Structure formats: structure tokens, C-alpha cells
């Protein structure tokens, strides 16, 4: 039985995951808040993936190419922001790194994500005034609901869904879903002007 369930999980499609995100938020927040919250989570997930990839690239360069195995030296290089920024990758601290954020207890998750957004806004010139502030506390979701949405977003694995424009597919799904159902004052053709997906692809 367990093997069968594991197989079903492995076969879960991207569209199923994204639908589950929307379904978890059904009737729980304003349409625009749900849209912004989901897009922000996707953004944090993908810059976290880029950060991990860059970290492994740096490690590979030091160990495999340069032949250096000094642990202290490796850790020092991995902690240098310029090693990431030179390739257009955001340098993330534990406070802003997806893999750390998702370990937060459900009751503290909204504050943790809002703090991450503020930190990025303060420290990354490219993201200044680009991300919605206090969106997680503003929506006031029950801790369990936010945790379930975060868990769904965490399933979006670039290694599993091998698509050169995966984040584009995810953004398009949410933007279409919420533009179709958006309030009239939002307009039918919502175009994101704040979060630039090019910064995470």
C-alpha cells in the first residue's frame, strides 16, 4: 500500500500541485492577496534553487577543478556574496533561504516569510520595492493552511519537472487563474510589474 501511495506522489503533475495551492486558499483571502502570496512563494522557492545550484558549482570548481580540499577555505568561498552575484544569483542567508524557511513552525511561518521579504528588499537593490511587504501576515491565513500551501510549492522540483521555462509555466498558471477571476477593478489583463521572473531563471 505504501509503495502504491509513493508511486502516486511521484506521478503528481505540476498542474495538480498548482491546483492544490489554489484550492487550499479558496475563500480564505482576497483574490489579489492570494495571487501575490503564491507568486512570492514561487519566487522564494526558485531563487533558493538557483542559490543551491550556484553553491554546488562553486564547490565543484574548488574541489574538482582546483583540487583544493581545505574545508575552511571551501566554506569561506561559499560564504562570499560575490561568488554568487557574479553569475546573477542572489546570495541568501538562512533568513531568506527557502530550505531553511520551510522548517519554521507553522505558527511562525507567516512572520518568517515576511521577514525574508523585508531582508531581500533591504539588501538586494534589484528587489527594492519589488516584492509585496507583509503579504503573509496581511492574509492572516491559519498556520496549517499556509503550511499546506508551502508544502505544495516545495514539490515544484526543477529536477523532476524538467522544463527550461518552469518558472514561466508556474507564473503563467497563477496569473491566468487569478486574472480570469480577479475583481473588476484589477482589470482582466493583469501583468506582473514587480517580480521579474528573469531574475530567477
Residue map of PLM features:
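Non-catalytic, mostly N-terminal accessory regions of nucleic-acid modification and defense proteins
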Residues: 1-197
